[in-house]
Amino acid sequence: MKNNIVSKLLNLLENEGSNIQYGNENVTQLEHALQCAELAEQNNFSKEIITAALLHDIGHLLYDGKDPIHDGKDGYHENLGAEYLSTYYGEEVTRPIKAHVACKRYLSAVEEGYYEILSEASKISLEAQGGPFTKEEAEEFINQPFMKEAVELRRFDDQAKV
C-alpha cells in the first residue's frame, strides 16, 4: 500500500508540480519540493522530515481547479495536504506539514530579522495567512509536539526558491 501512495505522490509532483509555479516565485512546485527535501537531507534530518520536506506543499496540488493562494486568499493547503497524507504517514510527517505555514507566523513574531529575509511573495502570503503571531500565540504554538521540526521545515521552505 505504501508503495502505491509513494508512486501516486511522485506522479502528482512530476505531472502537476512541474507545470505549476510555486506561488509568485521563480520555481515550480516540483522544483521547490525537491529543493526542500535536498536541504533536509543535506542537514542530516530523519527520513520523516525529509519526506515532510518533499510533500509539505502537496495540498497546493490537490485542489480541484485553481489554488486560492493565487487570488491572495489562504486556501489552507497545509491542512489539506496533512489530512490527505495522514492515512499513509504518521504525525512525525504530517504535523510539521500542517504547521509549516504557522511557522512563518511564529518566526515572524519571535525571530528578529526573519520577516526581512522573506521574499515579497512570502510576505504577501504571510498577510493572507493571518500575519505574525502574538507573543501568547507563539508561546502556545512552539510547545506543541513536532513544532521544532516544523520550524526547520519552514526554514527549508524559505530557502528552496532558486
Specify the residue positions occupied by each region the protein language model found.
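Metal-dependent phosphohydrolase cores
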Residues: 1-162
